[in-house]
């Protein structure tokens, strides 16, 4: 799911606090972002896990990644990746390819040609609570 952050979405994201690492990102000309996501789990049923890629339209960038944003516009489209593991427990790493269709019109952003690329904030597995930034240049 890719969505714009809003008050309703902010409430829904409160449970999306589990860690996820991004590997092998690929952005195509037809605006599909494919990533290999790694996360901790115990069930082989990956449908237990939910992922949400969010454009934070809030001026103050409030939320889990607020402190990771640059102080001024750096020319990139910034997105936030969230993970919810449901009732699954963290036992071993699992991997899944996930594909997101990104539409500037849907997000209410500038066209991709006006950006240098995309930066995705995420909390990777196997680390402290630090945020990492994945950069995809156009």
Where are the model-predicted features located?
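Short loop/turn segments at connectors of secondary-structure elements within structured domains
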Residues: 45-47, 114, 130
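Intrinsic-disorder/low-complexity, polar/charged segments enriched in Ser/Thr/Lys/Arg/Asp/Glu/Gln
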Residues: 32-34, 97-99, 133
